[in-house]
Amino acid sequence: MRPSGRSANQVRPVTLTRNYTKHAEGSVLVAFGDTKVLCTASIEEGVPRFLKGQGQGWITAEYGMLPRATHTRNAREAAKGKQGGRTMEIQRLIARALRAAVDLKVLGEFTITLDCDVIQADGGTRTASITGACVALADALNKLIAAGKLKKNPMKGMVAAVSVGIVNGEALCDLEYVEDSVAETDMNVVMTEDGRIIEVQGTAEGEPFTHEELLTLLALARGGIESIVTTQKAALQN
């Protein structure tokens, strides 16, 4: 029995509260159980220097955790004077994932920055960030269309992510912290709404996993992501 009482293939309750802040073009408070992340999408005209004159847009991301998002306080990275390796890895993952959701040529020369700030962490902060940021991005793009700055929606479809892992020999979907901290295998999977893989990050923390276990985990992830995408689409209809 999992601590939450969930079945092995069941994701935590996922909520997506849109328009959570008033200034950003897109803003979403996403919750995967007790993991909560504020995701905002900000639009700027123009693109980075390496893309100028190419007629395409850019999507980038920043990620951070509030000092008391975890059990004990962590100093702000700004106070340390630099970002940690984990932070840089996660924000690059978020950006890569969301670029897969958009036709950058159709976007044109706009830059959209996705800021993901973890308010409370209970496992799966990067997967929650990707899921919430995708909805914030969709809202931001709709505002560009409403303002007459885009004729066509560059969004190709939803992108979502979930963690999977092996805990005490059992493959589980959407690990909370108490499961993640003892997992023999920990994996994050990002997919499009039609089940195509954008990224797989998998590590054997204890015991190496087999090819068959990998396929089991990917199947679990796909089922979880299908459920999450349904929630994303429902949120965008409200």
Curated annotation (Swiss-Prot):
Domain of life (superkingdom): Bacteria
Signal sequence, renumbered to the chain: none
Gene3D superfamilies in UniProt: GHMP Kinase, N-terminal domain
InterPro entries listed in its UniProt record: ExoRNase_PH_dom1 (IPR001247), ExoRNase_PH_dom2 (IPR015847), ExoRNase_PH_dom2_sf (IPR036345), PNPase/RNase_PH_dom_sf (IPR027408), Ribosomal_Su5_D2-typ_SF (IPR020568), RNase_PH (IPR050080), RNase_PH_bac-type (IPR002381), RNase_PH_CS (IPR018336)
UniProt keyword terms in alphabetical order: Nucleotidyltransferase, RNA-binding, rRNA processing, Transferase, tRNA processing, tRNA-binding
Main enzyme class: transferase
EC number: 2.7.7.56
Coiled-coil intervals, chain numbering: none
Alphabetized HAMAP family for the sequence: RNase_PH (MF_00564)
Quaternary assembly: Homohexameric ring arranged as a trimer of dimers.
Protein's name in the database: Ribonuclease PH
Organism: Enterobacter sp. (strain 638)
